[in-house]
Every structure is written in structure tokens, then in C-alpha cells.
């Protein structure tokens, strides 16, 4: 379900859509049902006025990689952003795992509750660190009047607006295009712009729409663990062919998956940005 087959299919067959539709028919036969996600969380954002600024929707996986949340908090504070957390006390599921498991009705309930929380927050912009959440909110939620941004887009905007100034380092980076961010949301340039403002950006063996999945896909419900590891190792080999100092990604699932197998440092782009903020360079 990484989307590469769809992106490269010469006749445009939506194999991911076909798989998901089939799972909705046979969902009782799947080994995982994600029942623990069927109850929506409560967004921590309380309505205050007509524009509370930015709502940060971290999501389930980002709460398992707290360094991303810590880094985003520093970025918000440095930029002088008015912001609220949608899920400060625990990850709010976007509904995607339920959809992938064929639990369509349960997913609709989660989506309806999250939509209500977002609309009642008073925020006009939602920033997400998880590209899986971003894709679902774009495609499945009715959020009229709300701007949805992945944190790479948001950070890139801050840099262009000179609300965030970064130090230049001698480090070299390679960027891994997460499946849902690249092939799913067509976001390729913003993360590269951000990294080039910090250090040297090296090329991977396969990039953009040809990028290899990290191996941690939520959609591969029956894939053997050893097969997942093979995918992860293949992706790491492709990413490190030009010997970068660090592997940078922009998805909490990719970060967690790569970090477990890589001998080289793996970080989220928000961490790289937060570590290289030029203190005292921004005039508030």
C-alpha cells in the first residue's frame, strides 16, 4: 500500500484503492482489526475566538516519536506562532489504520469526531507531522475554510517569511521521501528546500516517486516481519549510496522504522531544523 505501483503503473490502475475496497468486504478475516482506535480522542483545543492561529495535529505515530513534538514546539515558539495542540495528552487517530483494515464505519465515526474538534478549535490552519494523517484529512475530511499543511510545508513557509532563520552546518543529508508525503500528497520540493538552507543535500539512489518504502507501512497487515526488514535494509542501502552524515525523513513511522535498523543517524526534518535555529537572528 505504499503507492509505488500506482505511481509507476503504465495504465493507471489504482491497486491501492482496489485493495482497500476488498478489505472492506472481507474485514472480518483480517488478522488485525484496530478496535482500540475506534473511539476518537478529544482534541485539546478549546474555542476562544474566530482565529486561534495554528492547530498542531501530531497524530498517533508522532506521539511514539516525541522528539518530533518537542522540535515542533520549539519551532512554533521561535516563530512566535499562536498555536494549540489537537492531541497534547495522547495521539488522536486520523482513521487511516481503520480504513486500511476495512473498518469503514468505525473510521467514519473517528473522522466525524475529529472534524468536529478541528472546526470548533477556531484555528484556520492545521499543521501535521504525519503524512498519513495529512493525506486522510485532505481526502476524507470535510474541513471547509481550513488550510492543511505538512510540517515541511509550514517550516518552508516560515523560512521564506524570515520568521525562522537557520544556521548553516557542514553536515550532509539525504532525504527519504515518505510514501504518503511524496506519492500520496505530491510534496517533494519543500523538505529539500528546508534541508538545503541548513547543509549539503545529497541524492539518494532512488528519489521522489521512485522512493522505496521504509518497510513499516500500516497497510501491509500480513507481511512477514523478516520481509519488512528486507525492505527497510534495501531502502537504507539506496539512501546511503552517497555516504551522507544523516538520513532525514518527514514521517514518524519512517523515523521509527529506519532508526531501529540503521547504523547511521536518522532524524525527522523538524529535529534538524530545531537543532539549527539561529538564536537571536529573528526580530520579533
Annotate each predicted stretch with a short phrase.
Residues 4-284:
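Iron-sulfur cluster-binding electron-transfer modules in prokaryotic oxidoreductases
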